[in-house]
């Protein structure tokens, strides 16, 4: 019987989250944590996860709309992943992309990345309501990505073909706790702030745009001191947007006192945890030792991983 295996990576946001929803650029990278989707031909369709069943229906509907039909033999879907869920690492984008490619492949449809993006975007919207598309573009393309959503119908990205300078050490992720809110909730929170304080919010978005541009240059040129300062400033703006809770802020201040910098990585969270923090320090071992002492969850990552792919 036919079996299809597809995988997609998680992602990090160097800078630009939330502002990217409003037409500002985001700088992202795929990481070496992946989700695997396996579709197997079977005599009877079987999907145990209700959320996955709903997502499958959304993507199937998009495929039917595009290709005017959806005829297949019965199949089962299984998922395995080492991307933490609900921590800002793009698990929903990775799942939407991998499931889309797996279904298209199972149906014998071979299409380009633009079509895969458009179909998978309906799945990402199922999770987040009005996603920018940046996470999805990154997990499909892989590597480092510069992304900007001009309009719903115009999403522009550039695959950055450089690697971080040799002076730049290892980024790590430290878990500040799982957010109580969904990414959709946090996007709505920023939307309400923009309505209540449009000038303040726009100024923060403008600042994030300049810092995001600086981040690209700093990673390319290898200026560690300026990189740390850039991360700090970007994080302060995110705090002013109201997407970083006290728990995460306290941990970030400790990391700064140790000589490093940290920021949320995605939608964030306010009431409890804010998900995985993207952390940088010239002496990463110092941070690892601190995290070990405090029993904090740490993920070591490699930046610039391969994007969406068929594994079997």
Predicted regions and their residues:
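Glycine/charged-rich beta-loop-alpha catalytic/anionic-binding loops adjacent to active sites
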Residues: 73-85
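Short alpha-helical patches at coil-to-helix transitions and adjacent helical residues
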Residues: 11, 93-97, 134
């Amino acid at each position: 019987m036919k079996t299809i295996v597809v995988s997609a990576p998680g992602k990090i946001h160097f800078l630009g989250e939330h502002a990217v929803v409003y037409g500002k650029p985001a700088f992202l990278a795929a990481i070496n944590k992946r989700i695997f989707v396996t579709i197997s031909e079977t005599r009877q369709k079987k999907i145990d996860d209700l959320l996955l069943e709903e997502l499958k229906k959304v993507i199937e509907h998009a495929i039917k709309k595009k290709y005017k039909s959806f005829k297949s033999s019965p199949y089962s879907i299984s998922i395995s992943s080492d991307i933490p869920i609900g921590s800002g690492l793009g698990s929903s984008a990775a799942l939407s992309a991998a499931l889309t490619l797996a279904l298209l492949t199972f149906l014998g449809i071979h299409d380009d990345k633009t079509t895969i993006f458009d179909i998978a975007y309906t799945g990402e919207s199922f999770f987040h309501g009005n996603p920018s598309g940046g996470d999805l573009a990154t997990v499909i393309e892989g590597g480092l990505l510069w992304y900007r959503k001009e309009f719903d119908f115009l999403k522009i990205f550039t695959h950055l073909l450089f690697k971080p300078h040799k002076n730049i050490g290892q980024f790590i992720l430290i878990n500040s706790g799982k957010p109580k809110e969904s990414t959709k909730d946090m996007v709505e929170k920023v939307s309400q702030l923009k309505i209540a304080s449009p000038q303040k919010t726009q100024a923060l978005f403008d600042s994030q745009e300049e810092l995001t541009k600086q981040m690209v240059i700093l990673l390319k040129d290898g200026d560690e001191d300026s990189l740390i300062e850039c991360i700090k400033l970007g994080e302060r703006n995110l705090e002013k947007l109201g997407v970083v809770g006290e728990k995460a802020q306290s941990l970030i201040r400790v990391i700064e006192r140790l000589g490093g910098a940290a920021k949320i990585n995605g939608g964030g969270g306010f009431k409890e945890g804010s998900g995985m923090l993207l952390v940088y320090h010239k002496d990463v071992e110092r941070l690892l030792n601190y995290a070990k002492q405090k029993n904090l969850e740490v993920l070591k990552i490699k930046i610039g991983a391969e994007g969406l792919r068929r594994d079997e």
